[in-house]
Amino acid sequence: MVRTPAYSHTISHHHPIVAFEDVRVPAANLVGAEGDGMAFAYEWFRFERLMVAARCLGAADRLTAEMTAFAAVRQAGGLPISQHGLVAGMLADSLTELFAARAMTYETARAIDQGADVKVSHAQCSMAKLYCSEMAGRVADRAVQVFGGRGYMRENVAERFFRELRVERIWEGTSEIQRMIIARQMTKRGPALLA
């Protein structure tokens, strides 16, 4: 290991930098056949992308609950801010997007459990990861707005999730990569098969 960079987020993942020089792996220690490593990586990506979607569901659920509770007690103009149209819209949009993301993620997991075509489920995992990670970012942004100045303070759940959810759109394939995977499968298989 060359080094392990420190990260400021609280997620317990670290990405050590590893360098190999003149390494030989005996044939008995190979996992699968030589040159098949990407097949293992693709299979891993399929499930990891679904896990990213699930993590984002949990974060969005927590944020939606926290900002709804706060908006019910925080007063502005003699009313709870949840009764002001623009704040009510942010709450409603967050819950609606969470509902859609949850349905997408659960349906994708169900299809995999029932033996769906690997290429189709790979694209669907990419769709779930793309939608859920982008959705969680929008929910976090709304939560910071609902909490106001408190939402920007380090000890506030909205600030922490706003900062930490950003990486969900990057690791296991950026949102741009997910869009390329989805579009490629759409052109090969047709959108009806993927949706």
Task: Explain the meaning of each model-derived region.
Residues 55, 86-96, 127-134:
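DHp/HisKA dimerization-phosphoacceptor four-helix bundle of two-component histidine kinases
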Residues 38-39, 85-92, 119-122, 126, ...:
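Alpha-helical membrane and juxtamembrane elements of multi-pass inner-membrane transport
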Residues 68-80, 95-131, 144-152:
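C-terminal helix-coil-helix/basic helical segment that borders enzyme active sites and/or dimer interfaces
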Residues 1-66, 79, 175-180, 184-195:
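FAD-binding core of flavoproteins
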Residues 123-195:
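Alpha-helix capping/hinge segments and adjacent helical runs
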Residues 4-6, 28-45, 69-84, 111, ...:
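Conserved catalytic-core motifs characterized by acidic clusters
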